[in-house]
UniProtKB/Swiss-Prot annotation:
Coiled coil listed as a keyword: yes
Subcellular location: Early endosome
One cellular component (GO) term of this entry: early endosome
GO process annotations (BP): bone mineralization involved in bone maturation; bone remodeling; bone resorption; odontogenesis of dentin-containing tooth; sensory perception of sound; tooth eruption
Protein name per Swiss-Prot or TrEMBL: Coiled-coil domain-containing protein 154
Gene behind the chain: Ccdc154
Amino acid sequence: MSEPADGPSLRLSPSHLSTVTLEDLELLLTEGLVSAETSERDECSGRASGSLVPEQDTSKLWKQLEQWVAELQAEVVRLRGHKERCEHATLGLLRELLQVRARVQMQASELRQLRQVVQQAAWSPEKEELELSGPQSQNQMQTLDKRLVEVREALTHIRRKQALQDSERKHSEQEINLRLTNLTGMLSQEEQGREAACSALQKNQEDTSQKVDLGLAKMQAQMTKLNEEMSLRFLKREAKLCSFLQKSFLALEQRMKSSESTRQIAESSLREELESRWQKLHELTEERLRALRAQREEEEGHLLEQCRGLDKAVVYLTKFVRQNQVSLNRVLMAEQKAREAKVSLEETQAGELASYVHENLEAVQMAGKLAQQETQDALELLQEKSQVLEGSVAGLDQQLKDLSDHCLALSWRLDLQEQTLGLKLSQKQAAWEGMERESLKDLVQWLKEVTAHLEEVQEKVNSLPQQIESISNKCVIHKSEVDVKISAEGKAREFEVETVRQELAALLMSVQLLKEENPGRKIAEIQGQLATFQKQMIKLENSLQANKTIQNLKFNNETKLRTEEIATLRESMLRLWSEEGPWPLTLGSKRVFMSLVRQRFFIKDVALDAMVSVNSWGVYQAVRWLRWKRFLLNLVAQKRPGVTSAMTQWKPAYEVTSLTVFQK
C-alpha cells in the first residue's frame, strides 16, 4: 500500500493531529474569555496571530506527508529491484542444474560407448581363434597379445575418465554450495540492513514522541499562564471598578449641584459603546467559526478521497497476490512432475543396463568355455602357449568382472544420489507447505484481532467528540452565567447609587430648610440622618468587599475546574493514543511509539481544526503496514531463500494488503 506516504524523516504520529485540535480548543476558550475584555485593543491582534497557528501546522503536515509518500515510493522501487535480483538468481541456479544434468547424461552415454568397445574387444579375439588354422597359430598369438595390450590401455583410459568425471562432479557440487552460501550471505546482509533501518525508524519515532510530550508540556504551561493572566485581569478590573466607585462617590459628594442630565448622557454613550463592541466581537467569533467549519469540510473531503484511493489499492494488491500464488503453485507442480518423470526414466535405464551387462557376461563365459574346448582338441602340440593364453584370458575375465562391479557401483551411486535429491525435494516441499499453512493461520488470527481492535478504537474515538462538545457547552454555560452575574451586580450597584442619590437629594433639601428656618430640632434630625447615611455607606463598602471576595473565590474555583477538565480530557486523549497509537518497527512486539502507542493498526482520526471524527488513514498506519510487510518477507526469505521474489508483491488486503497481504 503506497500509503499517505512517509518515511523515517517524517514520523508524523496522530499525536500531532491531537495537539492541533487541542490548540484549536484552547484558542476558542481563550477567545471566549478574551471577548469580555473590550477595553484592551492589543488582545485583538493576539487572537489574530493565534488563529494563524493551525494553518501553519496544516501546511507543515502536508509537506511532511508528501515527503513520506516519496520515501514509500522509493522503498517500493527498491523492493521491486530486490525481487528482480532474486528471480535472476533462481533462473541462474536452474540453468546450472540443467547443465549438471546434461553433463551426467553425457557421462552415461560415454560409459555405454566404453562398454560396447570392451565387449567388441572381448569378442574379436575369440572369433579370430575360430577362423585361424593350425599353421597360423604364431600370428594369432601375436595378434592376441596386441589386443590384450589395447584392452589394458582402454581400461586405463576408462578409469582415468571415471576419475575425471568424479572430480568434475565434486567441483560442480562445490560451486553450487558456494553459490548457495553466497546467496544466503546476501540475504542475511539485506536482513541486517532492514533491521538497521527499523532501528533508525524507531529512534526517529521516539524523538517525535518526546517532541510531542514537550509540546504538550508547553501547552499546559500556556494554559496555566492564560489562567493566571485572566485572573489578574479580572482582579485588576475589580480594583478599577472599586476605585471608580470610590471616586464616583467622592464626585457625588463634591458635585451635588451638577446636573443629572450630563450623567445620563454619559451612561447612555457608554452603554452604546459597550453594545457596539460586544456586537463586533460576536461577529468576529461567528466569522472565525465559519472559516474553521469550511476548513474542516475541505479536509474531510481530502481525507475521504485518500481513503477511497487506498481501498482501491488494497483490492488491486489482493488480486495481484492471488495471481502470484496461483502462478507459483503451477510452477511447483510442473517441476515436481518433471522430476518424478526423470527419476522413473533413470530407474528404467539402470535396470536395462544391469540386464544387458548380465547377458553379455554370460555370453562371454559360454564363448570362453567353447573356445577352451576347441583349442584343447585342435592345439595339443602348443600346450605351453595355450597355458599362457589361458592365463591371459583369465586375467581378462577378472578385469571384465572388475569393470562390471565398477559399473554396478556407479549405478548404485546414481541411485543413492537420486534418492537423496528426492528426499531433499520432498522435505523442502513439506517445509514450504507448513510455512504457508502457518502464515495463513497467522494472517487469519491477525485479521480477527485487527477487527476486534478496530471496533474498540472506533468506540473510543466516537466518544471523543461528545466529550469535547460537553466541555464546549460547559464553557458557553459558564460564560452566560458570568455575564448574567455581572449584569445583575451592575443593576444592583446602579440601584444602590440611585438610593444614595435620593438620600443626598433629601439631605440637600434638609440643608436648604436649615438655611431658611434654623431650628435646633431639625439640626438634630439632620445629624441623625447623616449618621445613618454614614452607616449605610459603611455597609455598602462592606457589601462590595464581600461581593468582591465571593466573586474572586467563584472565579478561582471555576478556573480550577476548567483546568482539571482540560487536564482530564488531555489525559484521556494521551491514554487513547498510548493504547491505540502507532507501533514499533519490529513486528514481534506490539508497540511502535513506546511513549504513545500499543497495538495500533487502522483507526478513525480526528481531522485538523475539526471536532468530528473522520474515517481516514494516518501516517502511523502506513508505518505499521510496512513493518508487517518486512516481517513476513523476512520470514519467507529465511525459510525459502529461492522464492522470495514471488512473495515480495504482498500488501494489505490484508498491507495493503500489508504490505501483500504482503506488498505495495
